[in-house]
Every structure is written in C-alpha cells, then in structure tokens.
Amino acid sequence: MQVKENKQLCLISLGCSKNLVDSEVMLGKLYNYTLTNDVKSADVILINTCGFIESAKQESIQTILNAAKDKKEGAILIASGCLSERYKDEIKELIPEVDIFTGVGDYDKIDIMIAKKQNQFSEQVFLSEHYNARIITGSSVHAYVKISEGCNQKCSFCAIPSFKGKLQSRELDSILKEVEDLALKGYKDMTFIAQDSSSFLYDKGQKDGLIQLIRAIDKQQALKSARILYLYPSSTTLELIGAIESSPIFQNYFDMPIQHISDSMLKKMRRNSSQAHHLKLLNAMKQVKESFIRSTIIVGHPEENEGEFEELSAFLDEFRFDRLNIFAFSAEENTHAYSLEKVPKKTINARIKALNKIALKHQNHSFKALLNKPIKALVENKEGEYFYKARDLRWVPEVDGEILINDSELTTPLKPGHYTIMPSAFKDNILLAKVLSPF
C-alpha cells in the first residue's frame, strides 16, 4: 500500500517532450508526495531544466531564480536535467540558491538525493526502461515513449551530443513491454520520441530498427494510434516512409527537421545529407495519402548568404509544410559553428520575419483543408466550462493545434478517447468541431 507523505511537490518540466518523460520518471519515484502547482506552498520544488539553446537556458535560469525567491523557508529546490548537466562544473557557484543539482543520469535516484540532500552526477546518461514507473501527466489517453537517448550526428550547431552522449537505443522488447503496460492503463495513443528516432538500433548494428518497431507495434495491437517525432534525413529511408504509410496504427505524420535546403548550407551545417535526398524523402511523404508534414529550419547559421536564404525561402513557399518551426541560430559552446563568423542579428530577424509569413500562410491552408469533412481525432478532456479539448490524430499534443467541441451540442458527456469529428471553423491554431461518432 502506497502511503502519501504529508509533503507537497511542485514539478516544473521545461523544454521538450523527451524531458517530460524524464520528469514523469521522477514523479514515479516521488509518488508519495502530493502534487501542487504552487511553488510557495511546496516542500520540494523540482525543476527539470533545458540547456539546448540560449533562450532555453535563460528560461531555465529565470525559472530557478523565481522559485528561489518564492519558496517557503525550509523548502528544497532542485535543478535537474540538461542545463545542470551541461554546466555541472560551474553551475553550483553560479546559482547558489539551489539545494540539489543533478544532471541527465540519475532521474531514477531522485528520491535518494532528496533524502540525503546531496548532488549527484552519473557518467551514464539515463534511459527510461519499462520497469521505471512513470506518472503520466497531462492526459489520461496519450503518453510519450522514449526509444533512445543521445545522438551520433555531428551537426555544426548542436551541443546535445556533448552532454547527452552517443546514441544508446532501448531494447525493442523493453519498449513493447512499456507500451503494453501503458495501454492496459488506458493510454491508447502514443508518440515515440528520441533525439534521432530514425537511427533507432543503429548502435546495435541494425539499420531498420524503426521499421522493426513500427511492425512490432502493429502486431502487438495494444494501441489505437501513434506517431513518431524527430526523423533525421540521413537515416530516413523510403522504406521507413512506406512502413509508416502501411501501418494501421502509426499516423501519416512526418516530423523531419531539415534545417535548410541549400546544398552549400547543408554542408556548412554538417548535416550529412543533400538537397536531392531531402527532396526525395519530402516528395515521398507528400505522396502519402492525407500525410501531415512538419519540419524545423535554422535561420542565420554562420556564413548563410542572401542567395542561400532566398533558395530556402522559395523552397518553403513551394513545398508548403503543414507546420514549420523557425529558429534563429544560437551560438553554443562546444560546437563547430560557435567560433565561425556570425550573421548580423538584424539580418537574421528580417529573414525570420519573412519565413514566418510563409509558414503562417501554409499553416492556415493546412487548417482550412480540414473544414467540413470527417476526421479522426482524440478527445482529451474538458477545456473550461463549455468545451472539450481534442486534436487531429495526426497531431502531437500542444504542438500542432487544438480542436474545441462545444458541449451544448452533445446529448451525453464525452469520455476521453477516439472519435470521428467534423471541423466547421478555425481561428489562429484552433478548430471548432462537432462529434459524429466514436471509433
């Protein structure tokens, strides 16, 4: 029998969904605390930080300082995750307000660290396994599943390998066991994540690891829907695209950050790919029926000239991604691009503004294409007093958009789960829809 401590825990998980999985592992170890969103009343404040780019680092630092200012006397403030790991040699002196620091290797030991009130930094990066009990947050029907940690790519701008290490893939059986366990608890929709998902099992000498995973999930039949994030162009193949297309469970969702399209820029970025390869993959994705394609672009990488930017801009306008994330180059220590001559900030800002217009135009077109036709969706929960919150099955939670269903049009309350719905209008990134039937 699990006995609740008479203590409150405030968890703040910053950054990506991969960080969220690690936060949920820590919640699993701290199950006997009562969760609160109020920093001021918490006995333990746990901030799982992000240290990917400058803006994320600043957000993490500010969140820590705000918590330190607001915490009650005697409360324990903990900083875990990427920022702590990346700057572990200096962070203790830089932010003395923190009581416990830990990096990316000891999420499953957080309860011991709190009990002993001590820092801990293991050499090995933690990789969540099926036996690590997690408390899933934010949904009763959707969960993220991490399939690997680390990355073997050598992108000029990315510091992740310097603190997350080389690629280490989970065993396929461990993933299947976790999926089965979560599905039995009602999580019938999952998103599979990694730093480089398409390289899954490369470290074990297998080039078709992600295809194996897709087929094993299909055979298992524990889920009703799933999708994959973070395909890397050089390890993505036509066969992988075909496996996703033919899967009855995995949605035709393709998230592949290309970063650029110019061959000269791809070489400068050390992306180990080419425009021709990008186009081959992207055109194959677009040929898939009802495909949804998301990508990420970096603007202002050192030595990006006007011609290369214009080539990128023209391509993005022609290809029409459903969703597009656009980031300004962030100079990060321990990367090849850090010491290269920078593009002026004014130029970067102007380029981002131009690309954002293109991205918004095609995003709106993607939303409009859903109007007045039945789509498969996942109803998550009640949003306020009058609406249920839902999303297109191809979408990732909190990322690709939101669908609201007016409860006044319903004869009975909706349970979280899978439904066919009909969108009728949209504004910004929100669709309004009515329910047709469950499935």
Curated annotation (Swiss-Prot):
Signal peptide: none annotated. NCBIfam families: 30S ribosomal protein S12 methylthiotransferase RimO, MiaB/RimO family radical SAM methylthiotransferase. It is found in: Cytoplasm. Residues 7-119 form the MTTase N-terminal domain. [4Fe-4S] cluster 2 binds at residues 151, 155, 158. [4Fe-4S] cluster 1 binds at residues 16, 50, 82. Residues 137-368 form the Radical SAM core domain. Keywords: 4Fe-4S, Cytoplasm, Iron, Iron-sulfur, Metal-binding, S-adenosyl-L-methionine, Transferase. Belongs to the methylthiotransferase family. RimO subfamily. The gene is rimO. It comes from Helicobacter pylori (strain G27). This is Ribosomal protein uS12 methylthiotransferase RimO. It comes from the Bacteria. Its main location: cytoplasm. Its EC number is 2.8.4.4. GO terms for cellular component: cytosol.
